[in-house]
Amino acid sequence: MSLEKKVKNNGRIRKKNYERLLYEAKFYKSLYEQEKNKRISEERLVEKLKTALHVVKPLKAYPRTIPETSHREQELVLLFSDCQIGEKIQCKETGYLEYNIDVFEKRLGKLYTSVLNITERHRKDCGIDNLNVFMLGDIVEGRQIYKGQSSRVTTDVVEQMFRGQELIAGFLRSLSRYYDNIKVSCVCGNHGRVGKKNEELTHVNWDYVIYRNLQEILRNIGNIRIDVDKKWWKIVNVQGWKFYLEHGDRIKKFWQIPWYGIERADNRVLKMMRALNQDYDYFVIGHHHVPFECDANRGERICNGTFSSGNPYAMRDLKVMARPTQKLFGVHREVGITFRYNVRLDL
């Protein structure tokens, strides 16, 4: 290559390098200007925030207070239902917990210790001298409630009654040593009925017989009062709050869900009670074996659990199973229900 051509080629290369460097310089200068403007905007924002903070009023602090160490007395309420003492549930059939009259006795003992432990825990905070027991029915297990039931009962209802009233009387007698007063309010369930549905009056029921026998057995225990009458419902006053009690077997389910039926029943019962110049705050039932509560217009709708485990009918046909549970809660004169527990009986 001649010298003249080499000079021309070098000139073209230098020109391309110059153009590339000039482009890069413009590019990086553009990035610099963007970052510079961004930094200026951030600094302006910080200055504006500093200016705004000068006009913000200082935060108002609540005065230091000493928490209350003494509170007004509360009363304890125990929901007691759906024992179905004679029911027989076998683990080999359901794959779940066993249940029979001996298991009922063990779970009753568990309930006894749990009630006392919870009472002592809350007595450190407030006075608890009185215990209310809402017996919501299904204490025994009849033989004519559903088809094939006789094969799932361990003993006849008379033997259930004698054994059951002995155990429950001992339970109440033992609790009476720890409370000034125990008030037991009773309604009947459907599993203790005599005959088929609607054949007899509400109180023609083995639950009613057990309740009356408990009155007689415990008549000499001065601080236990058992309230039994022939109605299927009852309203009980606890610390000025009124509790409507019934078993709950006449409440309809929709798609095996009781919530809608309970809401409708509560609304209708409330209208009926007001027509009788009565009123209540809490709607309390058993029967459905699933412990729950939900808010109502004034108080709550509350459903108790069960002593038994899931039986084959409930688990196989209804696809429903619940742990053995009974409800326990405190009631304060000013606020109604305060603390609450689902007492597990299988632990």
PLM features per residue range, with description:
Residues 84-85, 140-141, 191-193, 250-251, ...:
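Short, solvent-exposed loop/turn segments at secondary-structure junctions
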Residues 28, 35, 64-83, 91-217:
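Core catalytic region of metal-dependent phosphoesterases/phosphodiesterases
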Residues 176, 203-232, 238-244, 249-345:
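Conserved beta-sheet core of the metallophosphoesterase superfamily
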Residues 182-190, 225-234:
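Acidic carboxylate-rich catalytic motifs and surrounding loops in phosphoryl-/glycosyl-chemistry enzymes
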Residues 12, 16, 60, 162, ...:
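Catalytic phosphate/metal-binding cores of nucleic-acid and nucleotide-processing enzymes, i.e., regions
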Residues 53-66:
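Short linear interaction motifs
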Residues 7, 11-21, 25, 29-32, ...:
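Heptad-repeat positions
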